[in-house]
Amino acid sequence: MNVLVVNAGSSSLKYQLLDTDTCEVFAKGNCERIGSDMGIFGHSENGGAKQTEEVPFPDHRSAIARVLEELEKTDFTIDGIGHRIVQGGWHFDDSAVVDDEVMAKILEVAPLAPLHNYGEAAAIEYCREKYPELPNVAVFDTSFHMTMPEVAYTYALPKDVCDKYHVRKYGAHGTSHRYEWMMAKEILGSRCHRLLSCHLGNGASLAAIEDGVCRDTTMGLTPLDGLMMGTRCGSIDPATVCYLQREGGYSYQEVDDMMNKQSGLLAISGISNDARDIRTRASEGDERCLLAFDMFAYKAMRQAGSMIASMAGVDTITFTAGIGENDWSIRKAFCDCFEWLGVRIDNNKNREAVGNGPQVISAAGSAVTVMVIPTDEEYMIAHDVERLTKNN
C-alpha cells in the first residue's frame, strides 16, 4: 500500500510517500516558513538529491497543495494519506479514519495545541477535498499515552477546573515511543517487559512502557513539561510564570515564548539549541556549553528515575531521536547514573552506535539491556493507515 505521510508543524510541513510492504520511500520533502511569502519547498524522489525552490506559503492549505501538485507530476500512486496530529485530547486512544466527526474532535481539542492542530486540520481538509476517494487517517501523538492510570495523568488542581477545561497529562511523542516498544520487543522477545523509552531530540520526553502499555510519560498537558529540551525549559516551579508577570512585567505571551522558544539548551549554552554545536564548544572547554550538557543529562536522569519507579523496575532502555541516536556522551552520562540499578554499557559499542539501525550497547552482564533504536514515525503512521483501511 502506498501511503503519503504528512507531518504538519506550526510553520512547516514534512511529507513522505512510502510502500508499507517494502518500506521503500518513493518521494519525500518539506515546506518551510509557512505563513510567509518567502517559503521554501524541497522535494526528492527515489533517494535522489533534493530540489528546492522559493514558494509563497500563506497557510498550510497552500503548502499541502504544493506537495500534491508535485506528486501528481510523478507516476507514483497514493492509496491513503496519514496525518500526524499533535493533540488528540481525551477523544482518541488510537488512530482514526477521518470523517466529519473526527475532524470536529480534532478542532475541539485544538486549544490544547493551537500552533499545531489548526494547521494539521487544514492539511487534512485540503486532502479530503482534493481526493475524496482516498482514506485519510489521523495518528495522534497523545493516543499511546491514554493507557496511563488516573493516578499518573491527574493534576492536583480543583476537579471542577480540570473537568471544565480538560486539564490533565496527555504526553506527546507517542508514535515514537510506540515504535521503540515494537522494535525492542521484536528484537528482545520475552526479555523486554518494562521499557524506558528515551526520545531525546530538540523535543525530548521519556515514557514508561510495561508490556506495551504506557504507564507514565514526562510531557504533560502540553509538550513544554518534563525534560529540558532544545528551546523549552521543561519542568519548573509553576509559580515562576506568576513571578515573572508580576515582578518583570512580562505578558502571558512573552512568558510563553520565553519558555517554549528561548529556554532549554539555547538559554543555558548561550549559543544554540543544536546539540552538535554545543558539543563542539563544550569540547573546547566552553563552560556554559558544558553546563548545558550536564543539565540535559542530569534532568533526564532525574525524571528517568520516576519513570522506572512507576513500573517498579526496568529491564530495557532505548535511546532515539537526534541526541539519543547520535550523542554517545549523553547516553554514557545517563547510563552511568544508573549503575546502582545494574546498568552497564559497552563503551566501544556505545561510541560506534551511530546510523547503523537498532543496536545493543549494554555490556555483557548488564542487568538492563540498553539499545539505540532510530525512530521511524513515518513507518508507524503508514502502517496505521494500512491497518485501519486495507480491509474496508
Where are these regions (language model features)?
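Glycine-rich beta-strand-to-loop/alpha-helix junction loops that act as flexible
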Residues: 8-9, 84-88, 200-202, 314, ...
